[in-house]
């Protein structure tokens, strides 16, 4: 009995003298949270698939030194608790629409700014341009490391008539997805409803909401064709582009050895091609899903996108730029990419 206790205490002593980062890396499975429906590497919502692919690839390259636990469907914590939990080091990683954290960090509302991004090419160009470098810096300052850049176009699903032109929104109760989207809807005469995308179905089903803006992927994953009679797609262009990156707590990231940090960043960047292709595919697939369900499907013209953009310039952009110096700087840098 004494020999066993001695061995146990020696084992504990050995562990306590290990470099902290090595002990951390070898004993902790990193938890990744997101709000989207769970699936497999091959099937389901591409955001869940991306997280699973990312985890599998890092585990493989690290020869099992890094392991992950994935929690889809807000099964680990509430959707809106994820960002602040990462900042505190209480959650390791999450894939979140960035604008959900805009109440906590005003600069992050740029992640869903109406009409500021109008194409995938422009969206992904942010990463290497001054706006992306500044956004990455802001996030790091707030305790977050950006691992994968993920952008998605979106549209509007409606229980009644399609919402295409600004005047179509008048008198309707609509979910925009961000404070800034809500501002252009209010300007167009709509009443706004604020909730995460995983709560849209119930609100539309009960009639608490007439229409919702969200990504093409969420229109499919949350089966909104069951409660919608019309869909305005983003397949020909959109004024609704959502930045939904895979992020990591800087407190956790900084504890890892350099080779593991580098591996996370490398694999994260490699996932971006998959994200772009999957998002574009969903922009096309969503139209077929809704047509099959009997919904009226319409697209946006360049002229209509410009109308919404003009409203955004005088409302959402102006409001965002006036918030603080950081917002003004990001807005100016983003406009350089238009």
From Swiss-Prot:
InterPro entries, per the entry: DctP_fam (IPR018389), TRAP_DctP_sf (IPR038404)
Main location group: periplasm
Keywords, ordered alphabetically: Periplasm, Signal, Transport
CC annotations in GO: periplasmic space
Subcellular location: Periplasm
Gene3D superfamilies registered for this protein in UniProt: Bacterial extracellular solute-binding protein, family 7 (3.40.190.170)
GO terms of biological process kind: C4-dicarboxylate transport; transmembrane transport
Superkingdom of the source species: Bacteria
Annotated malonate binding sites: 47, 100, 175, 197, 214-218, 244
Signal peptide: 1-25
Database matches in Pfam families: DctP
Subunit structure: The complex is comprised of an extracytoplasmic solute-binding protein and a heteromeric permease formed by two transmembrane proteins.
NCBIfam families cross-referenced by the UniProt entry: TRAP_S1
Record family assignment: Belongs to the bacterial solute-binding protein 7 family.
Function (record text): Solute-binding protein that binds malonate (in vitro). Probably part of a tripartite ATP-independent periplasmic (TRAP) transport system that mediates solute transport into the cytoplasm.
Name of the protein: Solute-binding protein Rfer_1840
Organism listed in the record: Albidiferax ferrireducens (strain ATCC BAA-621 / DSM 15236 / T118)
